Amino acid sequence: MKKYNIETNCIHGGYRAKKGEPQVPAIAQSTTYRYYDGADMADLFDLKEAGFFYSRIGNPTVGIFEDKMASLEGGVAGVAAASGSATIYSTILNICQKGDHIVSSSSIYGGTFNQFKVTLPAQDIEVTFIDQNDSLEELKKAIKPNTKAVFAETLSNPGMEVLDFEKFRLLADFAKSPLIVDNTLASPYLCRPIEHGANIVVNSATKWIDGHATSMGGIMVDGGNFNWEEHKDKYPGLVEPNESYHGLKFYETFGDAAFAVKYRVHILRDLGFTMAPQNAFLNIQGLDTLHLRMERHSENALKIARFLEDHPEVEWVNYPGLKSSKSYEAGQKYMPKGRGGVLTFGVKGGSKRAAQVLGNLELASLVTHVGDIRTSVLHPASTTHRQLSEEDQIKAGVR
């Protein structure tokens, strides 16, 4: 099949209407699907055949969104979920169980930080946070024999640090573990982590993918580039016989897509973090204009960052498109089309003065969100990262 550029794939990737089919994917608002042969149903439940039988596990509209995102990220398969947080949680649980360990950059979204610091340890999954700016040799000290994953964000929220993919790929290789990258703030238009060594990519589709603040959603894309068989002692759930499916072996049966299939028919089946068809439809509409929006968002953010950098009442500005940013060079390397639509800045006078600025806004909206076509503003320390201690806020890039 001919390869198209990413701008074309935003519109056409993952879905081509056949004769008589709708040009715009339809909403399959149904929980279940009719069959006329019991043997056909049995084959679906045994994973011998692909198809839809219950919308907790798969839905035609959601499936189109999954295929489109897999195409955009350059992976072998995608699985959608109800939110970005549900996606990250499910991704970790797909390879981790009681007694396991993961390593994560500390410069991550507050909800993810809390999930890793509070929720996972409550299930006896240990998380070690690292400073992603440390040397590779220093980062290696965090790796343990039971380390199952290395996690980071392409563009950290709200630290605005562009990930050094080369360094983190080497760290994951040292750990003999997959590199999981949250691509939310960049989107697959500005960066494709799999091309830079990531094995699994997650996105909160609620943000730039939807782009209009209308729907919740998350998506995991399996890069299909981690050899689970080579590390079978570490990842038995993907290699050894699965009790739920009468001894089926995911990697042996599904090859490069093993992680995605297990995620769907095991984790999504049991936890039910299912994306609604209506939300999938809205996210599909968002993808049609993703390339145009991300270009303009990046242009606008850079203009605002430059304006604020010269403003006498502004203490500092953090945006990887500025030459003053410590991530400027990494941004040029990994995000050449633009640095995204989010920036952070500090006003002189501290939090009290910041509150006054927020109260004086007219056009920009004070909301708990990024990724909207409308300009949004937020004070992370008192909102998205409020549950973190002051020390953890600093680690996460909140000033």
Residue ranges of model-derived segments:
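N-terminal "arm"/small-domain region of PLP-dependent enzymes with the aminotransferase-like
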Residues: 1-59, 67
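Conserved PLP-enzyme active-site core in the AAT-like
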Residues: 7-16, 78-310
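Short, acidic Gly/Pro/Ser/Thr-rich loop/turn segments
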Residues: 18, 34-38, 227-228, 290, ...
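Conserved N-terminal alpha-helix of the aminotransferase class I/II PLP-enzyme fold
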Residues: 37-86, 111-119
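Short amphipathic alpha-helical segments
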Residues: 50, 76, 279, 283, ...
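Acidic-histidine catalytic/liganding microenvironments
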Residues: 72, 308-312, 361
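Conserved C-terminal alpha-helix-loop-beta "cap" of PLP-dependent enzymes
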Residues: 294, 302, 313-399
